């Protein structure tokens, strides 16, 4: 369990940086329930920050949010797929009040197995007795019963896997069509009323259930392309704490994940619940610095977790529109999670030229599936790309 928050005045720093539009739709939106989400919305609005992807009800969470500038109007349609069912907003009806929360893009997965492995798992299900449990629970709860080609493996009520028969083994992911269409309709509306439409999705998910895979899962790729078809100027993925590749679709960029702007774990003033301390084997009266310093290094002093791999280099995207034509350039940033001074770890600085060159090569490799090529321009100090 990972529950965390910061004090409302932390948002003053975003306001001081003139960050105007912020998506608050993510897997922590309702860590402290619907009231926590409502408190966040009100704290942002009090500071002139426009909260995107969240609302006092589902209709508000799904709506585009706008910023008018001297150069034109920008719209943001924001949503989240990661654990979205835990935090989705709800509209009122005759019986219940509206519930604050996020704009969800819910999704599901099935584990597809060839005949031999499918039958093996079905036999194991019978040996465990969970097949009989599922049949009885399904009858009482009026669920669809198992079929010859699909069944749920595990506990009927406390977690199970959807198993399907197929020609090969793979993870089949699929999107909630109603959620997707509602988001696309918001994008169509925004495109009619703005000069630039940014569709953004908070998504940790990767291929084959791996949050740290190079590529996004199929449902994210398909959704991103549909946002462009609906009128988005670009699609921005965020959530995974490292950069994923870029696809150019119908002339518009899909940034599958920018990475992180900040990862100020050790020096940050996070507020952490007792349950989260327990998850990391600490007492409930521990300090945030206890938790985060333990996550930074192993007992033998070697770097661990976010400090041990590819999480330092991330990037910003500069969007420039001239004569109704949009151009994009990538500006790599270095969070340097291994700085000697732990107070500086996770704070962004512009990457040096050599790191920018290396990052252009990394993005080209991470975008191989899409055929996008990146090149570092020393005169501009940024990375350009074509698809």
What are these regions (language model features)?
Residues 1-387:
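Acidic, metal/ion-coordinating pockets
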């Amino acid at each position: 369990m990972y529950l965390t928050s910061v004090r409302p005045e932390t948002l003053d720093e975003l306001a001081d940086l003139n960050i105007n539009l912020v998506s608050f739709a993510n897997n922590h939106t309702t860590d402290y329930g619907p009231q926590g989400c409502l408190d966040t919305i009100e704290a942002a609005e009090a500071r002139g920050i426009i909260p995107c992807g969240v609302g006092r009800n589902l209709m508000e969470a799904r709506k585009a949010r706008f910023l008018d500038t001297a150069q034109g109007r920008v719209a943001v349609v924001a949503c989240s797929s990661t654990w979205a069912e835990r935090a989705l907003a709800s509209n009122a009806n005759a019986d219940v009040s509206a519930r604050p929360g996020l704009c969800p893009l819910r999704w599901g997965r099935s584990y597809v197995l060839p005949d031999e492995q499918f039958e093996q798992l079905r036999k194991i299900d019978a040996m465990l007795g969970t097949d009989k449990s599922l049949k009885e629970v399904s009858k009482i709860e009026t669920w669809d019963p198992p079929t010859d080609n699909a069944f749920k493996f595990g506990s009927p009520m406390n977690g199970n896997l959807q198993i399907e028969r197929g020609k090969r083994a793979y993870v089949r992911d699929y999107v909630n069509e109603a959620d997707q269409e509602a988001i696309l309709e918001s994008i169509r509306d925004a495109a009619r009323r703005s000069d630039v439409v940014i569709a953004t999705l908070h998504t940790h998910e990767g291929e084959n259930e791996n949050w740290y895979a190079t590529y996004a899962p199929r449902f994210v790729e398909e959704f991103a392309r549909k946002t462009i078809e609906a009128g988005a100027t670009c699609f921005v993925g965020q959530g995974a704490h490292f950069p994923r590749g870029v696809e150019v679709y119908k002339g518009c960029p899909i940034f599958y994940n920018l990475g992180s702007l900040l990862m100020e774990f050790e020096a940050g003033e996070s507020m952490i619940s007792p349950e989260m301390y327990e998850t990391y084997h600490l007492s409930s009266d521990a300090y945030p610095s206890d938790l985060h310093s333990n996550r930074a290094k192993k007992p033998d002093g070697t770097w661990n977790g976010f400090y041990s791999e590819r999480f330092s280099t991330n990037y910003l995207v500069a969007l420039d529109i001239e004569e109704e034509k949009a151009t994009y350039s990538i500006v790599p940033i270095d969070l340097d999670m291994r700085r000697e001074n732990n107070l500086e770890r996770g704070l962004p600085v512009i990457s040096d030229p050599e790191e920018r060159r290396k990052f252009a090569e990394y993005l080209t490799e991470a975008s191989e599936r899409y055929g996008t090529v990146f090149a570092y321009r020393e005169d501009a100090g940024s990375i350009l790309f074509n698809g």
